[in-house]
Design a protein with these regions (language model features):
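Short helices/loops that flank or line small-molecule/ion binding pockets
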Residues: 15, 40-48, 52, 151-165, ...
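Bilobed periplasmic-binding protein-like "clamshell/Venus-flytrap" ligand-binding domains
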Residues: 50-67, 240
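Extracytoplasmic/periplasmic substrate-recognition and gating elements
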Residues: 138-141, 180-240
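A ligand-binding cleft/hinge motif common to bilobed small-molecule-binding domains
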Residues: 167-186
């Protein structure tokens, strides 16, 4: 199986807490919930990092990411970060004529990535996306996050002090539901949820939003039927 999606992750229990909900509404003038756009995501990041600060005596953060110079840092942007902000065009499969990486394609061939050559890799949406990545990493994530790689940062939300993560892979699901984790209830159910990715201000209806590695799913006959049914529902969710 090489099929996974990049989605929004959040602490459902904190987002459902009446005290936190009331405090957020008083500060920002709207209800705490899954953010549809990056502006709301930033509000929530600021809320938990700055205005909440601690929950149950533990310092909490409104954002998690990674920034160490490493091959995995490339995935942070190639996995559709620029297009989530609104870089690229409407069109199948990944934006046409300008795709999710900001590369202009003509007759199935790349012809340019810069604005001067018809691309969008250094356009307003791409610049905005990069700046927000830097700003949020510095302002709202744990101090160690900029020095982490993809693999090092992935398990961090399971420690229980992260409120949300805009760039989270479903491949981390198995590591987030183990017994005894701070993000798992006593009955084994998760305290967290995932949701569709919020989009930036340059994004328009019809543009690609989010990312998935399209591969294959293998459901073994030897797997109990109830677990196979659950896996089939999960497969439909991450590919929808």
């Amino acid at each position: 199986d090489q099929q996974f999606a990049n989605l929004y992750w959040f602490r459902y229990d904190w987002f459902s807490d009446e005290g936190l909900k009331a405090k957020f509404a008083k500060l920002y003038g709207y209800d705490l919930g899954v953010p549809i756009n990056w502006s709301a995501y930033e509000d929530i990041a600021e809320f938990f990092s700055t205005h909440v600060g601690e929950i149950d005596g533990k310092k909490v953060y409104g954002h998690m990411d990674y920034g160490k110079k490493d091959p995995s840092l490339g995935w942070r942007f190639t996995d559709a970060w620029l297009s989530m902000a609104g870089a690229g065009d409407v069109g199948i499969p990944n934006g046409l004529p300008v795709d999710e990486w900001g590369i202009r394609v003509e007759n199935c061939r790349p012809v340019g990535s810069s604005v001067t050559r018809g691309g969008a890799a250094n356009g307003p949406a791409a610049v905005y996306a990069l700046q927000k990545y830097i700003d949020w990493l510095k302002a709202y994530a744990p101090s160690e996050a900029p020095g982490m790689t993809f693999s090092e940062s992935g398990p961090v939300p399971a420690q229980g002090h992260i409120a949300q993560q805009i760039f989270w892979y479903t491949t981390f699901t198995a590591d987030m539901i183990k017994d005894g984790l701070a993000v798992v209830n006593e009955d084994g159910t998760p305290k967290w949820r995932m949701a569709p990715s919020p989009h930036g201000p340059y994004w328009e209806e019809g543009m690609k939003l989010g990312y998935q590695d399209t591969g294959a799913w293998t459901l073994l006959k030897s797997t109990p039927l109830d677990r196979r049914k659950a896996a089939w529902l999960y497969a439909q969710f991450v590919t929808s």
